């Protein structure tokens, strides 16, 4: 089995607008890869392509030897945090994560409790998610992404709406995930604590890869 994520000439056109324009990358397993660029530069669309959430107009994505859309619909053992929505608003954070874990075949509540603690949320907080602040919602989104100890973790702007303590939590979590061998793809906007963990940084502009640096 291949030990790389291979993105080859990834192109996506939506209503005559090219949102991904021939991106090619090879990302070895176990690294932390940062993606930077202004809003609309293509970061989220690229992450969606790797996660199997969109079909490319042309090109391909293979994750550890399995071509997305051909060998599998989604990367196996994927942890994904793209936004802070999609939860059951009238239930608690613990209920949400325990339910998600159970339908994925995991032991629900223990995994959910551990994930909530890792992101600084109280597993016994009985408040409904509808009462959560944006920062708490962001933490919950990250918790569901790491709950099942993924092989590939994608974090799209995980520091949005977080204070300094929250940004530190994100940096610590990325460090821990890399230490156990997880491959991490993350986008952010100038948080030194997080950027210091990147093995390589890529910049996107208008759907194209602008540069990559060590």
Where are these regions (language model features)?
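Helix-to-loop junction immediately C-terminal to a conserved catalytic motif
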Residues: 51
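Conserved ABC ATPase "signature" region
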Residues: 98, 109-124
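H-loop/switch region of ABC-family ATPase nucleotide-binding domains
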Residues: 188-189
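Catalytic Walker B motif of ABC-type/P-loop ATPase nucleotide-binding domains
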Residues: 153-157
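Conserved ABC transporter NBD signature motif
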Residues: 59-74
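The feature captures the beta-strand-to-loop junction immediately N-terminal to the Walker
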Residues: 36-38
